[in-house]
């Protein structure tokens, strides 16, 4: 085990994340301005494409971090049969779910059942497709719909809060199936679709457009919310949720419905709205 991986295990994840949350929501201008200036400089954040490009106008760091983009900064792929990329970031991995397993990194994988919280939830995705998108601190942190879908259920799976940076992904076995996450099940024109919002070290929350804050509160058991019959439909490219700090979103598709855009591969930089896959 490398020193970096050992430190990843040793860090007090929840304490650090709780502290990060307090700082992110602080309206003390000395705190918010220092955090905004530090992150903007360190990660070369492009504020020109923000709906509000003035860093001094954000009352808290969290307002800055979850900032909206100006109209037209991202557009959906013109092909109406394209499923679109759900977020800005980088492809961590993508491919086929083989024997129920999802590839994480060299020598590392986890099962779809572990990720989703049950064998039953994973069955529709056997031999289907997965795409894992990592959002770095410099990226736009709202997650959008790859395809039009009606919300069926969410599953809050408690877990750890390991970093989801490249070193941790390479060094921590089954990382995405161990971190706290919100599994969002949708019914679409081609069948079921899942978007999984994975929490991480210093992630101070996940919010959805239909329910507000979902993570925290931190729990000790799997919590399901049934939305069937409530008519919560989100259009292709519409905002679905947001991270209150950088993390990862994983999209699962059932078998036989789509093929990934050929230019995509591990480590590909991606933007919200570009083609992720095309329906067959």
UniProtKB/Swiss-Prot annotation:
> According to its UniProt record, how is this protein modified after translation?
Is synthesized initially as an inactive proenzyme. Formation of the active enzyme involves a self-maturation process in which the active site pyruvoyl group is generated from an internal serine residue via an autocatalytic post-translational modification. Two non-identical subunits are generated from the proenzyme in this reaction, and the pyruvate is formed at the N-terminus of the alpha chain, which is derived from the carboxyl end of the proenzyme.
Its recorded reaction(s) are: a 1,2-diacyl-sn-glycero-3-phospho-L-serine + H(+) = a 1,2-diacyl-sn-glycero-3-phosphoethanolamine + CO2
Its gene name is psd
Membership in a protein family: Belongs to the phosphatidylserine decarboxylase family. PSD-B subfamily. Prokaryotic type I sub-subfamily.
Coarsely, its chief localization is: membrane
What is the name listed in the Swiss-Prot or TrEMBL entry for this protein?
A: Phosphatidylserine decarboxylase proenzyme
The organism encoding this protein is Stenotrophomonas maltophilia (strain R551-3)
Needs which cofactor?
pyruvate
Gene Ontology MF annotations: phosphatidylserine decarboxylase activity
């Amino acid at each position: 085990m490398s020193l970096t991986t050992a430190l990843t295990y040793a860090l007090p994840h929840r304490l650090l994340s709780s502290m990060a949350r307090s700082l992110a929501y602080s309206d003390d201008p000395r705190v918010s301005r220092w955090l905004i200036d530090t992150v903007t400089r360190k990660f070369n954040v492009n504020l020109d494409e923000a709906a509000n490009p003035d860093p001094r106008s954000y009352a808290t760091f969290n307002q800055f971090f979850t900032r909206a983009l100006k109209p037209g900064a991202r557009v959906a792929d013109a092909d109406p049969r394209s499923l679109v990329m759900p977020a800005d970031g980088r492809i961590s991995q993508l491919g086929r779910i083989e024997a129920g397993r999802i590839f994480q990194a060299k020598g590392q994988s986890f099962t779809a059942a572990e990720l989703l919280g049950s064998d039953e939830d994973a069955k529709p995705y056997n031999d289907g497709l997965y795409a894992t998108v990592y959002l770095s601190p410099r990226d736009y942190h709202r997650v959008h719909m790859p395809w039009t879908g009606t919300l069926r259920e969410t599953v809050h799976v408690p877990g750890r809060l390991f970093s989801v940076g490249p070193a941790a992904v390479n060094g921590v076995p089954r990382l995405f199936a161990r971190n706290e996450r919100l599994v969002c099940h949708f019914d679409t024109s081609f069948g079921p679709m899942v978007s999984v919002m994975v929490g991480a070290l210093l992630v101070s929350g996940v919010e959805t457009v239909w329910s507000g804050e979902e993570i925290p509160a931190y729990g000790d058991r799997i919590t399901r919310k049934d939305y069937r019959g409530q008519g919560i439909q989100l259009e292709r490219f519409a905002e679905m949720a947001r991270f209150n700090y950088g993390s990862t979103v994983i999209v699962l598709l059932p078998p036989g419905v789509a093929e990934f855009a050929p230019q995509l591969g591990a480590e590909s930089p991606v933007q919200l709205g570009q083609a992720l896959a095309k329906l067959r």
